[in-house]
Amino acid sequence: METTTTERRRLFATEKVGGRAVYRLQAATVAAGILLVLYYRATRVPAAGEGRAAWLGMAAAELWFAVYWVITQSVRWCPVRRRTFKNRLAERYKENLPGVDVFVCTADPHAEPPSLVISTILSVMAYNYPSEKISVYLSDDGGSILTFYALWEASMFAKKWLPFCRRYNIEPRSPAAYFSESEGHHNLCSPKEWSFIKNLYEEMRERIDSAVMSGKIPEEIKLKHKGFDEWNSEMTSKNHQPIVQVLIDGKSQNAVDDDGNVLPTLVYMAREKSPQYHHNFKAGALNALIRVSALISDSPVILNVDCDMYSNNSDSIRDALCFFLDEEMSHKIGFVQYPQNYNNMTKNNIYGNSLNVINHVEMRGLDSAGGCLYIGTGCFHRREILCGKKFSKDYKEDWGRGIKERGHENIDEIEEKAKSLATCTYELRTQWGNEIGVKYGCPVEDVITGLAIHCRGWESVYMEPQRAAFVGVAPATLAQTILQHKRWSEGNFTIFLSKHNTFLFGHGKISLQLQMGYCIYGLWAANSLPTIYYVMIPALGLVKGTPLFPEIMSPWATPFIYVFCVKTLYSLYEALLSGDTLKGWWNGQRMWMVKRITSYLYGFIDTIRKLLGLSKMSFEITAKVSDGDEAKRYEQEILEFGSSSPEFVIIATVALLNFVCLVAGLSKIMAGVWNVFLPQVILCGLIVITNIPIYEAMFVRKDKGRIPLPVTLASIGFVMLAFLLPIV
């Protein structure tokens, strides 16, 4: 009876993912195969001058792959999934729920169109949650009057949009996504009302897009809000004063929608920028938001989302609160992380951007180890913990406190005070960015901040509801994909090589399993060198007559074949289980290689350069838009090149090298030495088959997205140079 009572009290349940017995059997046999491969390499080293250097290089690469494989198993051993009971939350707390401050970050009105940003803003304003308890803050690091204008338009449209969402309980509550998904369908409301709201939205979007195209705001619009007076002709995105404007004051009697319900508070912030001070990128913006929001609303829960990551599930706040307010476990939980999902994925995931295996397999495994990663968007934090509070068994959060009382200050006075919290000099000689708030000094400020929270004793929870909580825009070109993964791999590798290395910083603070889990991503960049070696040297060995694998009829070929086949089949199983298609998995294998020889390689090089003081940290925004032709090719699942990027030269060189070497290898097999070189021919052939779209882009396609002739010529030159390598 006691157990039943306890179970009834719980606001969430934790369930183990099934199929572990089969997985562990597979892992054990693969581990045995890997040990046999390493033993073979160690005991069959050729004499000097007989391909010894190439053999030792292969052994080193395989040793690295073995170590990395062991690390990746840490998140597959015992994954869990979470289930919440929102009905119990409603029964227990009714309207006595904590306030929530929502942070949305943008930086460039051209890379991140304001019309996209405000759809995200409107979606988080429309949560199935008391509006008076929601405060939404937009950080505009570009300090653009265009973004402010778009937010002002959104504040007007919200008066009609929020009642519409509540009245018909629609999903999603991003107007752009809703009208795109429900085109021509309006079963929940009358066609007249549906068309009316849709027309209002489209007219607003056209006004915003027109202003962005012209770069100007109509003078009559500027007269409608005092905030437009903050801008002058001398301001730039890198040099401007702090701006804080409250567009909707949730405490004002006038802040109501068309149904008379209270509107959420809506605030625009552009922190001060000056060439004399480092602004610390997104981390600096988030810390400024923490301070400004503490003055205006000071809610105990903070949600941060990227500007393109709209709310797709209006119950996400309530799901997160099931963890924060659970009587038995809430005192341990520092943040609740939702997965990243995208609404612009092609059917077969042409660029491997779906993150399905990471979302459905790896993050669940990290959750079981005591903490999934903080990934910088779709994450609910407890304010005090984000601000540096250490874990204590006796600590109890005061969830009952409401939105901060204002006293006798009017909104203009609040705005002026808030500006002083968003200056360049406020953080000087303070612990902001170190012990307080989001951490500085790393391109992936989110991961290192989450690691610090875990090392202070807090756990985190990974919540994957049936309806995706947040949906965003994935890179739609190869260049954007490479850039995004270069930034991720560089940032995580920077952490690995810093004092925050999880094995050092996390020793005695977090479990070994979680330390290894962090290293899966921390070592992405380090995977580049052994991968490049493995996709080039065996191919060159075919041309130069250097065998690098056991003969195909030898018993020692068995562990090589077994490890390769079982690992490949299990990766296919994970991909299909996570929602990928067979072709999507195959595309993922291609992108696995492409990212390792480009994104991860550049991330590795740039990290080493920074450590040597040869370069400084930078942050490049992944564009959220692409032109019409690029978008069409993306929908047709055609790889996008189109420029003479050095990364494309690497891709073309590897593809062309393996093609030429395969032809040479086949001639050797026809000459009667198939038993010796067949393993290398098979490896080379698989790389060639994987790269068929690359050959098409080099020699067949005529569209603007093909590989340019200079890239093809450069790759031919590098292939010729590769044949001069003495290593084999």
UniProtKB/Swiss-Prot annotation:
It comes from Oryza sativa subsp. japonica. One of its GO terms (biological process) is cell wall organization. Belongs to the glycosyltransferase 2 family. Plant cellulose synthase-like E subfamily. Gene3D superfamilies: Spore Coat Polysaccharide Biosynthesis Protein SpsA, Chain A. It is found in: Golgi apparatus membrane. The keyword Glycosyltransferase applies. The gene is CSLE6. Thought to be a Golgi-localized beta-glycan synthase that polymerize the backbones of noncellulosic polysaccharides (hemicelluloses) of plant cell wall. One of its GO terms (cellular component) is plasma membrane. GO terms for molecular function: cellulose synthase (UDP-forming) activity; cellulose synthase activity. It is a multi-pass membrane protein. InterPro entries: Cellulose_synth, Nucleotide-diphossugar_trans. The chain crosses the membrane at residues 21-43, 53-73, 523-543, 546-566, 646-666, 669-689, 707-727. It holds the Pfam family Cellulose_synt. This is Cellulose synthase-like protein E6. Its main location: Golgi. Its EC number is 2.4.1.-. Keywords: Cell wall biogenesis/degradation, Glycosyltransferase, Golgi apparatus, Membrane, Transferase, Transmembrane, Transmembrane helix. The active site is at D141, D446.
